[in-house]
A protein has these predicted regions:
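Active-site-proximal specificity loops/subdomain of glycosyltransferases
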Residues: 1-35
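Short catalytic/ligand-binding loop motif for oxyanion handling, primarily in non-cytosolic enzymes
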Residues: 11-12, 45-49, 54-57, 122, ...
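Long, low-complexity C-terminal extensions of enzymes
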Residues: 14, 142-254
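Aromatic-acidic/polar surface patches that form glycan- and anion
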Residues: 16-20, 30, 79-80, 166-174
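GT-A fold catalytic core of metal-dependent nucleotide-sugar glycosyltransferases
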Residues: 27-66
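Long, charge-rich alpha-helical interaction segments
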Residues: 62-163
Length: 254
């Protein structure tokens, strides 16, 4: 385990930063980072051993390539603005008709749920010229540094602007632009994400605790719920569940 400071990979002009977008768009600059890497947020937990093929196959990042239109209903937050900006970058640099013709079997694939394949085919018929968005889970993302470099080469001013914002802004892009770039370019291996589960509130915590104790899924994300919850009670229940499978501290913990 290596401790990395923002000053190790961000330009001086961007420091200090309080923007996850600025950090995300420069993680490929972390000294010593491998070409193939997996990006986790701090609320994501593997709960059973996972093989390398859960993240990379034949050198390609594993991800879900099904098309899923961006939902812009109700209050629009920063992440929705970023998603629209990400999609604009992808559509500016990729011809959907050509990519679907070339990589169609990755966008509609038997590893996905049949309902998702039907939606993708419907979206391809309704919007043949432009990508409308892709399925996003709040889950670890497999990347190559080459993807980040390609996006920087394609949109240097946009990414510089995102990097220099001290706080997240509506005209930023985020790491999804690289994830979606991989999908649009066909540089990915189709992957079923049903073994990734997310969120924690009063209605889901019992199921999450059961999943942890039984280690029935690969990955768990204890995401922030949108509505107010009894945080202390939920945290205690989740902590007990985690301690049932991880009773001892790791060598990195005090």
């Amino acid at each position: 385990m290596s401790h990395v400071s923002h000053s190790d990979f961000l330009p001086k002009a961007a420091l200090p930063t309080f923007s996850s977008h600025a950090i995300e768009m420069n993680i490929h600059r972390i000294p010593g980072l491998a070409e193939h890497f997996v990006y986790f947020n701090d609320d994501m937990f593997p709960i059973r051993p996972m093989p390398e093929t859960a993240f990379f196959r034949d050198g390609q990042p594993c991800t879900c390539g099904e098309e899923h239109p961006i939902g812009l209903i109700g209050e629009i937050g920063i992440w929705q603005h970023a998603a629209v900006n990400d999609l604009g970058v992808v559509n500016a640099h990729f011809n959907k008709r050509k990519q679907v013709k070339k990589f169609g079997k990755k966008y509609v694939n038997r590893v996905y749920r049949w309902q998702d394949n039907i939606r993708t085919k419907a979206v391809e018929k309704l919007f043949p010229d432009y990508f409308t968005g892709f399925k996003n889970l709040h889950a670890p993302a497999a990347y190559t540094k080459s993807t980040f470099e390609a996006v920087w080469n394609a949109e240097p001013e946009l990414l510089k602007r995102t990097t220099l914002h001290r706080f997240r802004c509506a005209d930023d892009v985020n790491q999804w632009v690289c994830l979606w770039w991989q999908i649009a370019s066909g540089n990915f291996a189709p992957f079923n994400t049903d073994n990734f589960v997310s969120c924690a509130d009063e209605s889901t915590v019992d199921n999450l605790c059961r999943i942890i104790c039984e280690q029935s899924h690969d990955m768990l994300c204890v995401n922030d719920p949108e509505k107010a919850v009894d945080f202390d009670s939920l945290a205690l229940r989740l902590r007990k569940a985690f301690e049932s499978i991880l009773p001892n501290k790791s060598g990195f913990e005090k």
